[in-house]
């Protein structure tokens, strides 16, 4: 498929919420793709409320699969972290996230939550996101604060799923 599309596999990142068997299967494939894990919380209690699949594949299993992927592929891992005010933008979460990112040698991408009619949470403030990024950086974690794009047309990360649901599509 990659050859047909004219895209180098090295330019492709596969993103997952943490389906452990899928990560392990991808590690066995010959393609040198990068892996991004949508983590959003650094402990099982909070992550299970934000990412329900965590109840099936808890952090210890997810981290083991991600480490296996890194060791087999030698491709950079990314951790995706949607910043939610008062939910996962605390110093406690930053410390826990830094420990996970360090063990996995992962790069962390922070992005403000995009509002949808289905979300109760609100985005962290720009100053809180920057402070969280500083906390990670001070612990030796490579971190990027991502720009939110497409929010004005309901096409940003997380918003398309809601739009697809309104149209009867599955995401």
For each feature predicted by the language model, list its residue ranges.
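Radical SAM enzyme core and accessory elements
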Residues: 138, 148-171
């Amino acid at each position: 498929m990659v050859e047909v599309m004219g895209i180098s596999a090295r330019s492709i990142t596969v993103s997952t919420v943490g389906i452990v068997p899928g990560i392990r299967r991808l590690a066995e494939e010959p393609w040198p793709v990068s892996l991004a894990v949508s983590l959003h919380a650094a402990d099982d209690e909070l992550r299970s409320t934000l990412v329900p699949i965590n109840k099936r594949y808890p952090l210890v299993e997810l981290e083991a699969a991600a480490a296996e992927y890194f060791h087999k592929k030698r491709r950079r891992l990314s951790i995706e972290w949607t910043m939610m005010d008062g939910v996962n933008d605390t110093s406690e979460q930053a410390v826990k996230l830094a420990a996970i990112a360090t063990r996995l040698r992962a790069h962390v991408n922070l992005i403000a939550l995009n509002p949808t009619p289905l979300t109760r949470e609100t985005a962290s403030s720009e100053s809180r996101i920057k402070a969280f990024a500083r906390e990670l950086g001070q612990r030796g974690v490579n971190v990027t604060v991502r720009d939110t794009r497409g929010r004005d047309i309901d096409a940003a990360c997380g918003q398309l799923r809601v739009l697809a649901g309104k149209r009867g599509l599955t995401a």
